């Protein structure tokens, strides 16, 4: 039968095997085999290709070399033979629309391999004349594409390229087929071909269909001919399956629907698990009474159209051509896995017992009623299902017992083994109205776009790039960073881990037995029912462990009975055994206090559901009793775990999914450890003391997406499938390019990624050192101004944050992710908002900041290189005598040894002049007497020689009385002169003491003033510290605010949002799938709300920081680089002098120096003067103000001009005024409605309030007496008291300084100071005599030693003289020994 089917499929195209394949264009011959090979049709296949394709008609080619134009065009194709000549193509609207996009393509003459063409899709300002281009410069605006593309075409290869458009779909036929989605209304083309052998043009106006027969791979296995009959049906319904089981991208999905069990998507995009992975496509153009058996356990027999996959189907899709109605007499028989055969039948009669069954294929005018037909050994039962739609286009049957008609689920049964289709034949051989296809498919995750309930296009989510697009619910993504989920490889059955404290564990079974019997005429009546629990009506667990087992003993003489449970308990009968823990657990068939209920239902084959029994569970939470799937008894640690793989765990009551890893840590306290959000981080095995970490099975990663490919991944894991891994601060980066990125196309914060996937830090913008000359000048500071420093902090950027929505909400739970697909748009909005805001901020910050390495080095004192400066060269060394104020000569060291130094007090230069005159001679003592202030004086120190001289003079004068009395005059004069010296010395000392006291008192006054300044400095410092504290507080708030927001976001994970638990895995372990979905949906909604709040806060912060960044740029330009003329802009209050800026965390800290005014003068300002009604004058300078001042006599008024910046009144001069046209002041009358046109931000508050009040409903407010009025006021008492306390503390400090100043003023000391005079006195004569005697003795002794020793000494000579008399016997001579040095 399969051979017959494929024979009729091949019959219409058999003549193509012998038809000529050549195409004549412009007197040259080519073919379309290479062109059709771009469709990648897998052999063997017979398909019809339809659309805007090139025609084989030779007259449709344009062969001229001039400019050709055409309208109403939907595509243009170019045929290339050889010669490498160029061409120009322009595509636009007609009439031309400058607000729309136009396409321009130009290829210059170049036959080499480096040939390029320039393609532009831009908004051109006017209708341009077609012409060549040489670069990327264009007059177009808002270009979507403006690049050079490869355009090398090999000679003699029958190349055909082109571009077609239809609505929003643009198809490019180049080296392969590319599809783009661009909204356009193109209809006019203009072309120019430089040589007809290189660029013969063909314009396409209408669709063209080709019958394509692919017998083998390659161009030689392609045969084609124009399709002439039933072309639309073939093209819309038949395709050749790709090698990977995918449906070709160009397929129209005619009569293919999105399967749904509830509501049907009308328009939009959705990620869904659908039977779209094709194993085999059977194309049957003719039906000849088939009764075909399709098994879900084996592959489909027959010849598949396109590629075939050896895989058992999960769903069979029957695609029907609805051009006319074909009554498929018979039914669809469903063979269940239980061995029961059920029939899906339809009839236009509502009475199935009298109906003739037939399933209409196509459109019908009468309704058809569908039933489920069940045949038993003695009767037939029909169960009504639904009414068929007026037009049947597709029927889908899955192995899971689902039957879909036009995408809607009509029937849901258990597992199926096979399905049988029974139809009768009809029509003639050339009648293909019953054409249909059968597709053997499997379920796969896919992104599906639906328009009007029909599938428009799909994207299979089976590779990393496609999975990324599916997660973003987008067929096309912009370049950027996107979150992806990295899941460890799992087996189908995940291992289970259970950890608890060691204890004595006994075990018991809770056996629940449900007995029921169905009978009666309808076979749906419950005849008997009984339920026992371990043989009784109730049972309470009294062991440490237990296992619930449920037994059904249900009988029905008419067929099988299915069962189900309905529970309002936080668990099911099956999930209790999944290591759920309790403190108390009882079950009963009768009502218990505070118990929850589980109802058990039975569903007979041909009736409605009946409640068999109700079980009541009374329990309390705890860890005393644990449900286990099997007994775990004994005094032992019954814990078991699987390490280093993804496992489902129950650890000390925590349920979840993660990877358990042994660590080297040792923790004394506790047995399990959680995060702030309640997530399990680690636990300790109390038996061994080992600490194990618990990490998620899936990790959030960021994929770098560039040019429709993932070029790199930012991950917290060190292992990856990429070839290169780089460890960066805080994460690992995986890519196939390990080089450093220098030209990033993606920028996120300070990280950039290149097209190749390499990563690097974004290079800073470097600026040249700006050399500004230093200008000095004198300025005048008003006395009523005070200088102050104001601090201001402006934030420049935020710390970028990226949130993986799926990971945050579901924490890797697969079922939760399926539910989250309903909220995929919300997740995409959240993630894209954060990503785009962070990238925009990164671009703005990087373009704002520039770095100068030289300026940075000069500005940093720690790195300033000052080694070349030797300041010691300018420091000289000299001996200075502070007493004389001159450089004096000091005695040598030897002189200090030979003389005694006596320190006395002297008068100025008296001692020095005396020493210079006497030159050490005692007899010149009186001769060298000095005069000081007219009084003769002598130095007060007398040496021994002078003492003996004056003593001899005194004795001589006393010896002979009056005769020798004159000899005592020298003594008298010397004594008087020395007494005068002492008297004058005393006077000088007193005057010096007075000067010193005055100087000390002046110093005390200066110290007092200094303390006054210190007091004022403390006050100013207090104010300065206060302003700096405010700035630092703002910096701290900026740095900590984002961390607080993230912490708050994390805390939300421990909230259950009215679900039974905040753990998703715990919910699914306790409840059945439907009940758990309801609970998890609450968690999803709550966590998405928390994410939305966080994103809204973050986006608001981005907006604030963007405004702050712009303000910082203005303040740098106006305050730092220049002097601001705006009052209060730099510093908040006062006239700006200069500003300094310093880098701060995430921003800039400004230090503004301003003049703050203290006093103000109120004047009456005048805008202008009008003289005699003829001359009108106004001030020339805008910074001046004209005002009046009445004289004290009130007899006249004076006019003054002053600067607005400082009150400096002066008489006006002629140069201050400028004459204007007239004294008439012109006003423009506006209504309140017109004022916003002039002042857009003007708001009429009164009118707005009136409108609000008018819109309020007229109601009488309640009477609220004041005695019951409760108002809450902002209490700032504590803050005010703290400020007053600080002020009082500063005042007390000031008073203490004042007390110290008074004490210093009262401490005036009269000091006595005596000048120091150094006088050297010679030793007496007997000292010198002793010295001479000692020297003579020493010298004599040395001379004697020298002449008395040695062979030439005197003793030796004397000995030789007397040798003859005293010589003894001669001794034998001896040989002298030579010294020998042995090395």
From Swiss-Prot:
Entry keyword annotation includes Membrane: yes
Membrane side Virion surface: residue ranges: 26-1324
Entry's localization field: Virion membrane; Host endoplasmic reticulum-Golgi intermediate compartment membrane
TM segment ranges: 1325-1344
Intravirion-facing ranges: 1345-1383
GO CC terms, sorted: host cell endoplasmic reticulum-Golgi intermediate compartment membrane; membrane; viral envelope; virion membrane
Region (S1): 26-734
Residues in coiled coil: 1036-1080, 1272-1314
Fusion peptide, as annotated region: 955-975
Topology in membrane: Single-pass type I membrane protein
Region (Heptad repeat 2 (HR2)) residue spans: 1240-1336
PROSITE patterns with a match to the protein in the record: COV_S2_HR1 (PS51923), COV_S2_HR2 (PS51924)
Region Heptad repeat 1 (HR1), residue ranges: 969-1088
Gene3D superfamilies (UniProt xref): 1.20.5.300, 2.60.40.3130
Signal peptide: 1-25
Region (Interaction with host ANPEP): 617-745
Keyword Transcription regulation: no
Position of sequence motif KxHxx: 1379-1383
Protein family membership: Belongs to the alphacoronaviruses spike protein family.
Domain free text: The KxHxx motif seems to function as an ER retrieval signal.
HAMAP family reported for this sequence: ALPHA_CORONA_SPIKE
Role: S1 region attaches the virion to the cell membrane by interacting with host ANPEP/aminopeptidase N, initiating the infection. Binding to the receptor probably induces conformational changes in the S glycoprotein unmasking the fusion peptide of S2 region and activating membranes fusion. S2 region belongs to the class I viral fusion protein. Under the current model, the protein has at least 3 conformational states: pre-fusion native state, pre-hairpin intermediate state, and post-fusion hairpin state.
Protein name (Swiss-Prot/TrEMBL): Spike glycoprotein
Source species: Porcine epidemic diarrhea virus (strain CV777)
Organism classification: Viruses, Riboviria, Orthornavirae, Pisuviricota, Pisoniviricetes
């Amino acid at each position: 039968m399969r051979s017959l089917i494929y024979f009729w499929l091949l019959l219409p195209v058999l003549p193509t095997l012998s038809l000529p394949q050549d195409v004549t264009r412009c007197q040259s011959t080519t073919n379309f085999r290479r062109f059709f090979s771009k469709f990648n049709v897998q052999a063997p296949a017979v398909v019809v290709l339809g659309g805007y394709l090139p025609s084989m008609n030779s007259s449709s080619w344009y062969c001229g070399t001039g400019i050709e134009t055409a309208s109403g065009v939907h595509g243009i194709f170019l045929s290339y033979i050889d010669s490498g000549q160029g061409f120009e193509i322009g595509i636009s609207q007609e009439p031309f629309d400058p607000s729309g996009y136009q396409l321009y393509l130009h290829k210059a003459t170049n036959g080499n391999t480096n040939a390029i063409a320039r393609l532009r899709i831009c908004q051109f300002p006017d209708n341009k004349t077609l012409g060549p281009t040489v670069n990327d410069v264009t007059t177009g605006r808002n270009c979507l594409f403006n690049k050079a593309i490869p355009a090398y075409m090999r000679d003699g290869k029958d190349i055909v390229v082109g571009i077609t458009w239809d609505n929003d779909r643009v198809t490019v036929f180049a080296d392969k087929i590319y599809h783009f989605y661009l909204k356009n209304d193109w209809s006019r083309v203009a072309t120019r071909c430089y040589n007809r052998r290189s660029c013969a043009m063909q314009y396409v106006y209408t669709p063209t269909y080709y019958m394509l027969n692919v017998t083998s791979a390659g161009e030689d296995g392609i045969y084609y001919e124009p399709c002439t009959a039933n072309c639309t049906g073939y093209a819309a319904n038949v395709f050749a399956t790709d090698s990977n089981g995918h449906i070709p991208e160009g397929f129209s999905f005619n009569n293919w629907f999105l399967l749904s069990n509830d509501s049907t998507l009308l328009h939009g995009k959705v990620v869904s698990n659908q039977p779209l992975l094709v194993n085999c496509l059977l194309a049957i153009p003719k039906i000849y009474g088939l009764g075909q058996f399709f098994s879900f356990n084996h592959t489909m027999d027959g010849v598949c159209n396109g590629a075939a996959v050896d895989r058992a189907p999960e769903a069979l899709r029957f695609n029907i051509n609805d051009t006319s109605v074909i009554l498929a007499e018979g039914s669809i028989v469903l063979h269940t896995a239980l061995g029961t055969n059920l029939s899906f039948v339809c009839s236009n009669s509502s009475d199935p017992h009298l109906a003739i069954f037939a399933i209409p294929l196509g459109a019908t005018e009468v309704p058809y009623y569908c039933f489920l037909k069940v045949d038993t050994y003695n009767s037939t039962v029909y169960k009504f299902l639904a009414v068929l739609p007026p037009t049947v286009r597709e029927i889908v049957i899955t192995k899971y017992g689902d039957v879909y008609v036009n995408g809607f689920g009509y029937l849901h049964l258990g597992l199926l083994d096979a399905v049988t289709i029974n139809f009768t034949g009809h029509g003639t051989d050339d009648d293909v109205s019953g054409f249909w296809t059968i597709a053997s498919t499997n379920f796969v995750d896919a992104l599906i776009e639906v328009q009007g309930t029909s599938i428009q296009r799909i994207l299979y989510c089976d590779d990393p790039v496609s999975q990324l697009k599916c997660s973003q619910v987008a067929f096309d993504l912009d370049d950027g960073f996107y979150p992806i989920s990295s899941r460890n490889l799992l087996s189908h059955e995940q291992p289970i881990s259970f950890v608890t404290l060691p204890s004595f564990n006994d075990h018991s079974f809770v056996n629940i037995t449900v007995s029921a019997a169905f009978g009666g005429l309808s076979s749906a009546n419950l005849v008997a029912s009984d339920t026992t629990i371990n043989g009784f009506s109730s049972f309470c667990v009294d062991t440490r462990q237990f296992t619930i087992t449920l037994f059904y003993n249900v009988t029905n003489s008419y067929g099988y009975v299915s069962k189900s449970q309905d529970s309002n308990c936080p668990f099911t009968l099956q999930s209790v055994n999944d290591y759920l823990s309790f403190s108390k657990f009882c079950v009963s068939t009768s009502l218990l206090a505070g118990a929850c209920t589980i109802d058990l239902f039975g569903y007979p084959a041909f009736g409605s559901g009946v409640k068999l029994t109700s079980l009541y569970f009374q329990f309390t939470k705890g860890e005393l009793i644990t449900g286990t799937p099997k007994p775990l008894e004994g005094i032992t640690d019954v814990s078991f775990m699987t390490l280093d793989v993804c496992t489902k765990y129950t650890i000390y009551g925590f349920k979840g999914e993660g990877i358990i890893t042994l660590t080297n840590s040792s923790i004394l306290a506790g047995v399990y450890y959680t995060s702030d959000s309640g997530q399990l981080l680690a636990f300790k095995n109390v038996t061994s003391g080992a600490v194990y970490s618990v990490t998620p099975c899936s990790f959030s990663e960021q994929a770098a997406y560039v040019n429709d490919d993932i070029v790199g991944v930012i991950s917290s894991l060190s292992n990856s499938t990429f070839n290169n891994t780089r460890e960066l601060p805080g994460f690992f980066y995986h890519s196939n390019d390990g080089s450093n990125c220098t030209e990033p196309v993606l920028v996120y914060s300070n990280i950039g990624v290149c097209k190749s996937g390499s990563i690097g830090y974004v290079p800073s913008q470097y600026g040249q050192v700006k050399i500004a000359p230093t200008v000095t000048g004198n300025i005048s500071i008003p006395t009523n101004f005070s200088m102050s420093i104001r601090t201001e902090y402006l934030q420049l950027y935020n710390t970028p944050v990226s949130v993986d929505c799926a990971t945050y909400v579901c924490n890797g739970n697969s079922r939760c992710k399926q539910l989250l697909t309903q909220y995929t748009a919300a997740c995409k909005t959240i993630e894209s908002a954060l990503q785009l805001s962070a990238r925009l901020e990164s671009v703005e910050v990087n373009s704002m900041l520039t770095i100068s390495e030289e300026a940075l080095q000069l500005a940093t004192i720690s790195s300033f290189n000052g080694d070349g400066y030797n300041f010691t060269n300018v420091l000289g060394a000299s001996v200075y005598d502070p007493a004389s104020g001159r450089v004096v000569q000091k005695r040598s060291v030897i002189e200090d040894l030979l003389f005694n130094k006596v320190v006395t007090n002297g008068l100025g230069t008296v001692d020095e002049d005396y020493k210079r005159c006497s030159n050490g001679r005692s007899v010149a003592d009186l001769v060298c007497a000095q005069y000081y202030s007219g009084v003769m004086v002598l130095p007060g120190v007398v040496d021994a020689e002078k003492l003996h001289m004056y003593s001899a003079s005194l004795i001589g004068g006393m010896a002979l009385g009056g005769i020798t009395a004159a000899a005592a005059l020298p003594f008298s004069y010397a004594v008087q002169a020395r007494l005068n010296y002492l008297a004058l010395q005393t006077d000088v000392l007193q005057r010096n003491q007075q000067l010193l006291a005055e100087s000390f008192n002046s110093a005390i006054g200066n110290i007092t003033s200094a303390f006054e300044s210190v007091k004022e400095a403390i006050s100013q410092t207090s104010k300065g510290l206060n302003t700096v504290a405010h700035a630092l507080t703002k910096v701290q708030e900026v740095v900590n605010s984002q961390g607080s927001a993230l912490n708050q976001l994390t805390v939300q994970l421990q909230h259950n949002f009215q679900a039974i638990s905040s753990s998703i895995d715990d919910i699914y372990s306790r409840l059945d799938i439907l009940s758990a979905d309801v609970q998890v949906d609450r968690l999803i909604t709550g966590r998405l709300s928390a994410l939305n709040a966080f994103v809204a806060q973050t986006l608001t912060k981005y907006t604030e920081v963007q405004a702050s960044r712009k303000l910082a740029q203005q303040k740098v330009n106006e305050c730092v680089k220049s002097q601001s003329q705006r009052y209060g802009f730099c510093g908040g209050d006062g006239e700006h002098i200069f500003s300094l800026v310093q880098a701060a965390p995430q921003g800039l800290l400004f230090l503004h120096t301003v003049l703050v005014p203290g006093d103000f003068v109120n004047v009456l300002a005048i805008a202008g003067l009008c003289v005699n009604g003829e001359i009108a004058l106004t001030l020339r300078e805008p910074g001046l103000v004209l005002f009046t001042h009445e004289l004290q006599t009130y007899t006249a008024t004076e006019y003054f001009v002053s600067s607005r910046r400082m009150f400096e009144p002066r008489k006006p001069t002629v140069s201050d005024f400028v004459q204007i046209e007239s004294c008439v002041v012109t006003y423009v009358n506006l209504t309140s409605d017109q004022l916003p046109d002039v002042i857009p931000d003007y708001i009429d508050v009164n009118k707005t309030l009136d409108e609000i009040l008018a819109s309020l409903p007229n109601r009488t407010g309640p009477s609220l007496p004041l005695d019951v009025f409760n108002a809450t006021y902002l209490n700032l008492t504590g803050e005010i008291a703290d400020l007053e306390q600080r002020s009082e503390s500063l005042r007390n400090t000031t008073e203490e300084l004042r007390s110290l100043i008074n004490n210093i003023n009262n401490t005036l000391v009269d000091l006595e100071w005596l000048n120091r005079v150094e006088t050297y006195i010679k030793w007496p004569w007997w000292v010198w005599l002793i010295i001479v005697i000692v020297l003579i003795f020493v010298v004599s002794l040395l001379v004697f030693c020298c002449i008395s020793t040695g062979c030439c000494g005197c003793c030796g000579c004397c000995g030789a003289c007397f040798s003859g008399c005293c010589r003894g016997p001669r001794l034998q001579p001896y040989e002298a020994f030579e010294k020998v040095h042995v090395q």
